Amino acid sequence: CMWYDTPRLLCQLEIEYTDGSTELVVTDDSWKTTTGPLLHDAIFTGEEYDARLELDGWNRNGYKDSSWKKALLVRAPKGSLHAQLAPHEKIIRILQPVSCEQKDDSTYWYAFPEMISGWAHIKVQGNAGDRIKLRFVGEEKNDFGQVDLYTLRGGGVEQWEPRFTWHTFRYIEVTVSYTHLRAHETVLDL
C-alpha cells in the first residue's frame, strides 16, 4: 500500500481440528515469498492485476515452491499492536448498468442507477497481454484517482474483480487496449 511503508505480515493461526487437537502456525523464517499477479493495490484508488502472472495451484497442498525466496525478518513498525475488530466487506446486492455508451473504438461509458460504494466484476475474452482500464467516476464527473487495471491471461473467458479496494461512483469508463476484446458482462457488487 502506498501509505504503509514496506509490506509486512505478522500472523498467528490457531487451528482446532475435529478430534479436539490444536495447532499454532506463526510467521517465522520458514515462510516464503514470491511475486504474483497483484502488482499494486490501494484501498481508495484501485488495483493493478496481471493475470499472466498467476501461479496455478500455489494455494494447494503439494505446490512446488522451490523457486520462492525466504521471507525476510524485518523490524516491527513503530507503535503498539492492538486487535482491530471490523465487519468484513460483503456483497449486499448486484447492480447491472442502466446504459452503455460507446465513446470510440476502445472506450465505453457505463451508467448505473445510483451513486454507490462497491467494485466492478468483469467477464471478458481477449488475448494474453490485452489490458482493461476501469475508471470509476462520481456524479460530479471526477474520478478522484479511482482506477483498476486488468491484464488478460488469454485463452478463454476470464472473470475478475479486485480484492483489496472499493470505489464510490455512479459511472465506469472502460478502456480496452485492443478492439477485439469482448466484454461479456460488467456488473457491480455492492
Task: Walk through the language-model features, giving the residues of each.
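Extracellular/oxidizing-compartment recognition motifs
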Residues: 1-182, 188
